[in-house]
Design a protein with these regions (language model features):
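Catalytic cores of the polymerase beta-like nucleotidyltransferase superfamily
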Residues: 1-389
């Protein structure tokens, strides 16, 4: 019998009280917290499954003084709120009907039935909260040891139940996988067109999640070869794959964390209108759209003056453009753009009438100020006097 090692997350405030409230024999830690503990990775999200129906979970939590929120009660999920972080509690379920986008579920009482509706074997590991014994119904432990991402049961059937599992497969493969599972790859290729039926928001969420991984290049390249990427991001060509590879290397070499919007920009041609089209299609936020468009334009400016670039585009976008050009962006770490010290009143005080001429002079002096490396106010006033002399 395999046992879950002790880990820091198990000592989070409130978890012991939750186990008492639900009953240790009536709940199991499940999913990512079990998987990542076995891999000695940091655990962020804690989930548990229980035989109790949602209303019973709510009653037990309230009786124990635990704040609980019915976040997805129709699907059997409520969230217990603790200072150490929330815990999602889901009643055992089995699928009654699926249409590739959402499932109709019925509550169950069998742990294996609940495990059977999950996507991958490595995500269907259940751990007893007191004994730490692991229940593994589909060979997830062996797959975890082999770093194999494998669908539970028939891969095609799992994908037909939820088409988003195609993208989830590549995300988990990029994060955990070593060797590719032939059955999974074939199923993803054959059913790739089903991604067209998903909401744009769900596609965007998974796409950006893949982009945020330390090195998603191999996963994206396999997606491109199989035609999966062409369904959700047809703008990507081999040239863009090369750009992504270069960006990943530049981020690593210069100590920048992976950034999903920057990575997405690398997958697009260097054209702002194309980036805008993609942003609209994926329903990105306005801020994400603006940043994607700026990054996609690539470098047109001199990379020798990164601070000038940051003054024009803000730090984040300047870093994007520099890294995508393979240029040094480290100077911008923690850098804050200074405020332009010249006011219109100083120009008017020197005899220039208020109006467009003042604005023109302001722009001229500001450009010189930036090119000289943002000197102090005294130097700016000297520039002004020189310009008016």
């Amino acid at each position: 019998m395999s046992v879950l090692p002790q880990a820091g997350w198990m000592q989070r405030e409130g978890l012991a009280e939750l186990v008492v409230a639900l009953g240790a024999d009536h709940m199991r830690w499940v999913g990512g917290c079990v998987r990542d503990t076995l891999l000695a990775l940091d655990v962020h999200d804690v989930d548990c499954a229980t035989i109790h129906l949602p209303n019973e979970v709510i009653r037990r939590c309230k009786d124990a003084g635990i704040k609980v929120v019915p976040t997805g009660i129709d699907h059997g999920t409520v969230t217990a709120v603790f200072k150490g972080g929330p815990v999602e509690i889901t009643t055992l379920r089995q699928d009654v009907a699926t249409d590739g986008r959402r499932a109709t579920v019925a509550f169950a009482s069998d742990w294996k039935d609940d495990a059977a509706r999950r996507d991958f074997t490595i995500n269907a590991l259940y751990a007893h909260p007191e004994t730490s014994e692991i229940d593994d119904y589909f060979g997830g432990l062996d797959d975890l040891d082999a770093r194999t991402v494998r669908f539970i049961g028939d891969a095609r059937q799992r994908i037909k139940e939820d088409h988003l599992r195609i993208l989830r497969y590549f995300r988990f493969q990029a994060r955990f996988g070593a060797e590719w599972d032939d059955e999974a790859v074939t199923a993803c290729e054959e059913l790739s067109a089903t991604l067209k039926g998903l909401s744009r928001e769900r596609v965007a969420m998974e796409l950006l999640a893949i982009c945020a991984l330390p090195d998603p290049y191999a996963a994206f390249e396999r997606m491109r070869e199989l035609g999966v990427l062409a369904v959700i991001l047809p703008e990507t060509t081999p040239a863009q794959m090369t750009a992504l590879q270069g960006l990943i290397a530049a981020e690593a070499a210069q100590g920048f964390a992976p950034d999903p919007i920057r990575r997405l920009a690398a997958l697009l041609p260097p054209l702002a209108p194309v980036a805008e089209t993609v942003a609209v299609r994926l329903r990105l936020s306005r801020a994400q759209r603006a940043r994607l468009m700026t990054a996609a334009e690539r470098m047109g400016e001199d990379a020798e003056n990164p601070q000038a670039l940051a003054y024009k585009y803000k730090n984040e976008s300047a870093i994007d453009r520099l890294l995508m050009a393979g240029a040094d962006a480290q100077l911008l770490k923690g850098w804050e753009a200074p405020r332009f010290p010249l006011k219109g009143g100083a120009i008017v005080a020197r005899g220039v009438g208020a109006g467009p001429e003042v604005a023109r002079i302001m722009r001229e002096i500001e450009a010189r100020w930036v090119s000289e490396g943002f000197p102090d106010e005294a130097r700016v006033l000297q520039m002004l006097d020189d310009a008016l002399s």
